[in-house]
């Protein structure tokens, strides 16, 4: 009766409380029933806080109801719950599900499936038994499912690389699901999990203890995972302690089910026990109840905002179960997505939290639960060590199966990386390791560590040893030094960790030596090493003279100074004296019989053959010269092919590597003797430094200032040129050289090793692990496992021999020398250009006037003709068209020499060079002497009568600049001039005198000539148009022809380029214009012709002194011919040197005017005063009326388009034209000075 009285009183109190509520107030309030699983002090304290006033911060009014379930009888529990649901309008239930209330949770799940009332468990004790829940149940749990706990437990195993483990379960409900979950996770993972043993024991009261002991003693796994209840866990750990499975050498992991309450762990639980709980494991019962009530209130508030009213209360247990109403289903959906105080309470359809935050806890040495890890959003964050393996004095606990291993980061043996930022764990093929920080927690109990991931050659050796020898390990990085050195009597580094028993083992690039072997034990060496030297390849800098390095300097000198010059001179000499080629004879002035092949052309020919240049060249004609050129061409092929074949080897970047023979090399022993001093160093506190310090004192003293903090710093110093050589362990250096980017680092002698030794595993003195580890290492060497690991970790791409010679593109550094050569050539050209202008504009004016200049002129002309030759002209039968662009410089020189020969013979020099020089000097003095003025009459050879013209003659082409303007002269008496008179183009008189001398064919349109006769007309008109005065002032004598016989061509910019067709067309037009009538008027003439020959004043009166003399009453020395005007005066060579005016160029003569005269050389020109009658040596032009022309001489004419002048024409004219005893002195002087002006 007493058992039924309690629930009855409880229901009576609940009904009274519900009846006391106002109607209106109850409709706006959410009723929540809180069911406690026990009636302890915590539950009593929580009940006192369950008042509406404690939930005022929630959006809705809360009416809490409490109920305690002290009896585990299912019938009594159902009576209480159903009575509560029938008496009160309850919206939801909050249930305290401890681990000992699994039956209550199952009953509540059944009630929820029948009444559709939301039930929220807040402690997580029912998470295991309610997998899965009843269909249609609205049971929600703040705890985590068994599957989620297994996920975190396996993450802890993965974190420490505990791949081998055993599973022990009891017959507690859910153990089959647990085993199934373990196998599913192990099979789905990419890690090679090894499930060593699976035991299912009867751990309840009265179970077979002997069988349990026997099975537990068969377990040989260092890691064990157990599944049982709290009471069964106490029995299991007690039996495991007797079987030797409890202690520092074994790790136990259990789910939340085995813990129960975390307030007071049982005494049988071992230190270091690991479990997984929710983040609310430290919250009080009152806080958990408040979270449950808030979730129901927030869900109801969300429902009211959508539908405008609160959800309907739950139904009665006595009513017939039916389908879930839409309102209850909608309210349940609103409960699945709730956020409270910044925490996400989203539930899955199975009733568990979607993203729960779990905590990994471990039982420390003080018998308290301590958080060592946190699982948040799929990432595990662990704090090291997982279990307290150290005492308060940091001394490790004696463990026969678990080892603490110290290591040191050094590639490739130990490579340290950060964890994966996405998962927070280590990627496959890596092992979790820790690095101790320099500070501690505020409590001072646990030293914090930084989680890292380690991999490498030594890590793979360690993992293989752990599997073969069967031990677990805790890996950490040393922070108080390097490998190990004794400093002031204290060992540091890995040696110190092992020596002072802070670590059971040390593995890494630890060299075995005698000093270390005295205090610790080493295993057999697993890697052969020693001391090696690493250097850096120098940056490939190509010398600017790299393109010249295929041949030695002696070969280049022999090629271009000796061979090219000698062969060029030889070819030239053979060609010079060849009977079929050019014979350069300057003294006789012979015309060339063939092409001109000079020494310059010979050098150009040989140079073009050497480099296969497609340039215009002139080939020799002699057989001997051709043979020499063929031999040179064969030589050039061999020379160029050899140069090209060896050029690529010198144009690539030259890399220099320091070579040393060993530690006793003079570069190490006497580094100061090198320039600059040799710089080398190592990493201190290692076996390399100890070896050098013990054997080479002076070497160690020098290298101390160049020591590096780490291998990476040393490699950087080598590449930057701060270090010349780095001395270190051969195994490390070979790896660094093989993995170096760009293969800039190399070890001397292809990895030559000095003081050969090996790497070993350090263990404590007289350790019982030494024999087992030595046998395992020897087994790895015999099976080839070590060689496989060396291939994976210790080899690099730079060790491949095919990469020793690497091809690369030639950049600007490779071709710098060629560009430098071009820049130097441009600079020299600029200097020569500046010097040329300086000499031309400044220095040449300061040259004193001396008669030696004429000799220098002849000498320079000879040298010029030697190197440039004389142009060979075609047959004179057909004069070529003028080359307006080239100027025919070579032809002019030859003509000048021929004319000089005739003039010298006329001046009676008799071939003597000295007499010729004196004659030229006398002529110059006579020209500079003052001339007396004469007022007497001048005699003039009669010529054809002229007709006055109103204006002066202008150049052809329509130009407005006069051809010549008369200089104003004082009036003088008429003079008599003997010579050719100036013609009058507008008047045709005295034609009978011309027709008698020259036959004329007359047609219906006038007089016509044959083509050959017309070609002879221009030269005749010029050669006979000469005149000398018997008496005229010497000051007016220019000493040179009035118009240049061989004028220099104008500038290309001002000169229109005319071809043969244009020139022939102009000649035809002029001939047609003059042939239209017997007496053309000035107005009827073409503008180009009329302007060229108009004159401003009438022709003078009669000239006397000839048979056909005509009076010249108005004749004056300065008014009748163009040549005597000062504007057309051409300076001599001497005057050009003194005054800076080029010889043979008029000071005021314009380029286009000069072109006109040069182009129309067949037109009549004024050479003296105009006479009315033609001289006996002249004749009328058959096609140009009013002009006269000289007779032809052996077919030589000065026609259109040619600059040739026969040497015998002037001589014949001097005898036949005027009928005098040779030329007067003035005329001869004028001819010689003409040669000088041409030069």
Curated annotation (Swiss-Prot):
Residue positions the entry lists as glycosylated: 70, 73, 337, 438, 539, 685
SMART domains: Lig_chan-Glu_bd (SM00918), PBPe (SM00079)
Name the record gives this protein: Glutamate receptor ionotropic, NMDA 2C
Name of the encoding gene: Grin2c
Function: Component of N-methyl-D-aspartate (NMDA) receptors (NMDARs) that function as heterotetrameric, ligand-gated cation channels with high calcium permeability and voltage-dependent block by Mg(2+). Participates in synaptic plasticity for learning and memory formation by contributing to the slow phase of excitatory postsynaptic current and long-term synaptic potentiation. Channel activation requires binding of the neurotransmitter L-glutamate to the GluN2 subunit, glycine or D-serine binding to the GluN1 subunit, plus membrane depolarization to eliminate channel inhibition by Mg(2+).
Pore-forming: annotated span: 601-620
GO biological process entries: calcium ion transmembrane import into cytosol; directional locomotion; excitatory postsynaptic potential; ionotropic glutamate receptor signaling pathway; monoatomic cation transmembrane transport; negative regulation of protein catabolic process; neuromuscular process controlling balance; positive regulation of excitatory postsynaptic potential
Residues noted as binding L-glutamate in the record, renumbered to the chain: 509, 511, 516, 687-688, 729
Organism: Mus musculus (Mouse)
Compartments it resides in: Cell membrane; Postsynaptic cell membrane
Subunit structure: Heterotetramer. Forms heterotetrameric channels composed of two GluN1/zeta subunits (GRIN1), and two identical GluN2/epsilon subunits (GRIN2A, GRIN2B, GRIN2C or GRIN2D) or GluN3 subunits (GRIN3A or GRIN3B) (in vitro). Can also form heterotetrameric channels that contain at least one zeta subunit (GRIN1), at least one epsilon subunit, plus GRIN3A or GRIN3B. In vivo, the subunit composition may depend on the expression levels of the different subunits. Interacts with PDZ domains of PATJ and DLG4.
Residues with the Phosphoserine modification: 875, 881, 912
Disulfide links within the chain: 82-317, 426-453, 433-454, 743-798
Keyword Transmembrane on entry: yes
Site positions (Functional determinant of NMDA receptors): 612
Keywords: Calcium, Cell membrane, Disulfide bond, Glycoprotein, Ion channel, Ion transport, Ligand-gated ion channel, Magnesium, Membrane, Phosphoprotein, Postsynaptic cell membrane, Receptor, Signal, Synapse, Transmembrane, Transmembrane helix, Transport
Motif PDZ-binding boundaries: 1237-1239
Reactions catalysed: Ca(2+)(in) = Ca(2+)(out); Na(+)(in) = Na(+)(out); K(+)(in) = K(+)(out)
Stored InterPro entries: ANF_lig-bd_rcpt, Glu/Gly-bd, Iono_Glu_rcpt_met, Ionotropic_Glu_rcpt, Iontro_rcpt_C, NMDAR2_C, Peripla_BP_I
Segments on the Extracellular side according to the record's topology features: 20-554, 645-813
């Amino acid at each position: 009766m007493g058992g039924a009285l309690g629930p009855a009183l409880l229901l009576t109190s609940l009904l009274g409380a519900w009846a006391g509520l106002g109607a209106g107030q109850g409709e706006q309030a959410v009723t929540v029933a809180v069911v406690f699983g026990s009636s302890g002090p915590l539950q009593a304290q929580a009940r006192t806080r369950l008042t509406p006033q404690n939930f005022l911060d929630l959006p809705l009014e809360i009416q809490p109801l409490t109920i305690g379930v002290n009896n585990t009888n299912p019938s009594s529990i159902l009576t209480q719950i159903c009575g509560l649901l029938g008496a009160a309008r309850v919206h939801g239930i909050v249930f305290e599900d401890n681990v000992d209330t699994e039956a209550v949770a199952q009953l509540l799940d059944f009630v929820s499936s029948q009444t559709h009332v939301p039930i929220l468990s807040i402690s997580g004790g029912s998470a295991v038994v309610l997998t899965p829940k009843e269909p249609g149940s609205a049971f929600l749990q703040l705890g985590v499912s068994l599957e989620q706990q297994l996920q975190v437990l396996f993450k802890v195993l993965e974190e420490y690389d505990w791949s081998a483990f055993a599973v022990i379960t009891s017959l507690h409900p859910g153990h089959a699901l647990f085993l199934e979950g373990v196998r599913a996770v192990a099979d789905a993972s990419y890690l090679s999990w090894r499930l060593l043993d699976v035991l299912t024991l009867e751990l309840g009261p009265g179970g077979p203890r002997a069988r349990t002991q026997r099975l537990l003693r068969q377990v040989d796994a260092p890691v064990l995972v157990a599944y049982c209840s709290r009471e069964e866990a106490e029995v299991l750990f007690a039996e495991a302690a007797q079987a030797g499975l409890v202690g520092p050498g074994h790790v136990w992991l259990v789910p939340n089910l085995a813990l129960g309450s975390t307030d007071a762990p049982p005494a049988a639980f071992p230190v270091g026990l690991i479990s997984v709980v929710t983040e609310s494991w430290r919250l009080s019962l009152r806080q958990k109840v408040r979270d449950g009530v808030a979730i129901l209130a927030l869900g109801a508030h969300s429902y009211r905002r959508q539908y405008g009213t609160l959800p309907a209360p739950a139904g009665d247990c006595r009513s017939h179960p039916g389908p879930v109403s839409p309102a209850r289903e909608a309210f349940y959906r609103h409960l699945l997505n709730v956020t409270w105080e910044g925490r996400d309470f989203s539930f899955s359809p199975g009733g568990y939290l979607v993203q729960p935050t779990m905590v990994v806890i471990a039982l420390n040495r003080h018998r308290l639960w301590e958080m060592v890890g946190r699982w948040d959003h799929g990432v595990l964050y662990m704090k090291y060590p997982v279990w307290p393996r150290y005492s308060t004095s940091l001394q490790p606990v004696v463990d026969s199966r678990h080892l603490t291993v110290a290591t040191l980061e050094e590639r490739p043996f130990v490579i340290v990386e950060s964890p994966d930022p996405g998962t927070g764990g280590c990627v496959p093929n890596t092992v979790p390791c820790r690095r101790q920080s320099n500070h501690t927690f505020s409590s001072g109990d646990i030293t914090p560590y930084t989680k890292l991931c380690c991999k490498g050659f030594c890590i793979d050796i360690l993992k293989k040893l752990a599997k073969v020898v069967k031990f677990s390990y805790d890996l950490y990085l040393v922070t108080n030094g390097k490998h190990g050195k004794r400093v002031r009597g204290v060992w540091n580094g890995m040696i110190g960790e092992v020596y002072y028993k802070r670590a059971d083992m040390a593995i890494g690039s630890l060299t075995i030596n005698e000093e270390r072997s005295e205090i610790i034990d080493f295993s057999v060496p697993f890697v052969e090493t020693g001391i090696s030297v690493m250097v850096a390849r120098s940056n490939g800098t190509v010398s600017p003279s790299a393109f010249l390095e295929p041949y030695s300097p002696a070969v280049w000198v022999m090629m271009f100074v000796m061979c090219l010059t000698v062969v060029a001179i030889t070819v030239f000499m053979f060609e010079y004296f060849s009977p079929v080629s050019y014979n350069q004879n300057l003294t006789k002035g012979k015309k060339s019989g063939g092409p001109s092949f000079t020494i310059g052309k010979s050098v150009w020919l040989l140079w073009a053959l050497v480099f296969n240049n497609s340039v215009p060249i002139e080939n020799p004609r002699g057989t001997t010269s051709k043979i020499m050129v063929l031999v040179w061409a064969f030589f050039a092929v061999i020379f160029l092919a050899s140069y090209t074949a060896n050029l690529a080897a010198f144009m690539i970047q030259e890399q220099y590597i320091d070579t040393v023979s060993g530690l006793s090399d003079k570069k190490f022993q006497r580094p100061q003797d090198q320039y600059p001093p040799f710089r080398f160093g190592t990493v201190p506190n290692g076996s390399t430094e100890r070896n050098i310090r013990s054997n080479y004192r002076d070497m160690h003293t020098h290298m101390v200032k160049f020591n590096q903090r780490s291998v990476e710093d040393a490699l950087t110093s080598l590449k930057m040129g701060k270090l010349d050589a780095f001395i270190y362990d051969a195994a490390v250096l070979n790896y660094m050289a093989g993995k170096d980017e760009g293969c800039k680092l190399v070890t001397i002698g292809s990895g030559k090793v000095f003081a050969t030794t090996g790497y070993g595993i350090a263990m404590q003195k007289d350790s019982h692990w030494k024999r087992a580890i030595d046998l395992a290492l020897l087994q790895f060497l015999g099976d080839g496992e070590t060689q496989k690991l060396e291939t994976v970790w210790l080899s690099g791409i730079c060790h491949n021999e095919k990469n020793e010679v690497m091809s690369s593109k030639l950049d600007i550094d490779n071709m710098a020398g060629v560009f430098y050569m071009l820049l130097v050539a441009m600079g020299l050209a600029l200097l020569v250009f500046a010097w040329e202008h300086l000499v031309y504009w400044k220095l040449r004016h300061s040259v004193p006037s001396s008669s030696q200049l004429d000799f220098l002129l002849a000498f320079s002309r000879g040298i010029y003709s030697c190197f440039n030759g004389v142009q060979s002209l075609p047959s004179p039968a057909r004069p070529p068209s003028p080359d307006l662009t080239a100027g025919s410089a070579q032809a002019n020189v030859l003509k000048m020499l021929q004319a000089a020969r005739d003039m010298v013979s006329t001046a009676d020099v008799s071939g003597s060079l000295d007499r010729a020089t004196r004659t030229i000097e006398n002529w110059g003095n006579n020209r500079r002497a003052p001339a007396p003025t004469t007022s007497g009459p001048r005699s003039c050879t009669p010529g054809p009568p002229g007709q006055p013209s109103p204006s002066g003659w202008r150049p052809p082409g329509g130009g407005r600049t006069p051809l010549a303007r008369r200089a104003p002269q004082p009036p003088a008496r008429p003079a008599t001039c003997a010579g050719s008179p100036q013609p009058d183009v507008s008047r045709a008189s005295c034609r009978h005198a011309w027709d008698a001398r020259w036959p004329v064919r007359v047609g219906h349109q006038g007089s016509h000539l044959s083509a050959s006769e017309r070609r002879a007309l221009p030269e005749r008109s010029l050669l006979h148009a000469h005149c000398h005065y018997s008496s005229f002032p010497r000051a007016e004598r220019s000493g040179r022809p009035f118009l240049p016989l061989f004028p220099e061509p104008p500038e290309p910019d001002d000169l229109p380029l005319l071809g043969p067709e244009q020139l022939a067309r102009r000649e035809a037009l002029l001939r047609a214009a003059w042939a239209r009538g017997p007496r053309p008027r000035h107005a009827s003439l073409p503008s180009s012709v009329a302007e060229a020959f108009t004159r401003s004043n009438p022709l003078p009166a009669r000239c006397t002194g000839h048979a056909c003399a005509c009076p010249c009453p108005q004749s004056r020395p300065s008014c009748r011919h163009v040549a005597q005007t000062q504007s057309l005066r051409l300076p001599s060579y001497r005057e050009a040197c003194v005054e800076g005016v080029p010889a043979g160029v008029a000071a005021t003569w314009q380029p286009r005017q000069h072109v006109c005269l040069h182009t129309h050389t067949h037109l009549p020109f004024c050479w003296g005063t105009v006479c009315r009658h033609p001289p006996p040596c002249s004749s009328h032009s058959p096609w140009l009326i009013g002009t006269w022309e000289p007779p032809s001489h052996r077919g030589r004419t000065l026609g259109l388009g040619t600059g040739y002048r026969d040497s015998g024409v002037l001589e014949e004219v001097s005898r036949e034209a005027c009928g005098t005893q040779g030329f007067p002195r003035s005329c001869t002087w004028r001819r010689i000075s003409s040669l000088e002006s041409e030069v």
